[in-house]
């Protein structure tokens, strides 16, 4: 949707002050907000004499559709699933995932900042509840899951049967574009390895991190970042417990009384990218915690992003091989 007030493209509840734009490739913020909101009221705690009640607030109980996600963002949701649906299950996230249906659009014109193919993602053929393609003004629709079938049944009066000739041609055209993008052939060699201490202790980090402003922009636009903080507010009528996004790039992230949080920006910078490219895939069957959406490439004020990190270590590896 085009938010007139914020003058940016975003995915949010449809309202009268918003215009639908199916041509936009990427929203400014990722659609993870639909399942992991930037801020949500989890509980209200109330005291009545000696009795205390705790009332959950954020449990989603209505079905909804997220329309227009791209393949990279769908993969981002899968990354979040591993975090929030593992043991112990996050019931607030679980409720949204159970009630939400994702309709993903193929990327008609991938942008230069996109590099999803590096992580095995096919922008031409998204894996969601429903995969869709817009071709010559027509919407081609393919349900892939039970949720997708249920949604298709609900809108069947708007649909007609079609062969896949145009869709297959569109897929090929998209893949041909992707092959020509500048970051498509980045190498992930050396990442997601059990023996990672050489990379952890590499002097490359000291050179890379210095332009970092610790603004946190990369973490807030990222579809896979899942760090959050918990805040309690006493309204006088009860204590509200909120969950809100946080950033591992902030100096007070995970601040505790005994002061064991990371003490330097270099350490925080290194942790962010080691988590994306090493720790997460080692603990999740090789799935990387980057999906190549390119938002950090576009939004970092210092042009310091995961592509630069990967390239820096590619160069270091080449120098060693020489």
Q: Can you annotate each of these PLM segments?
A:
Residues 69, 74-214, 219-250:
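Catalytic cores of enzyme domains
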Residues 27-41, 177-188, 248, 256-263:
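Active-site-proximal helix-loop elements at catalytic-domain edges
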Residues 188-210, 228-322:
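Ferredoxin-type iron-sulfur electron-transfer modules in oxidoreductases and energy-metabolism complexes
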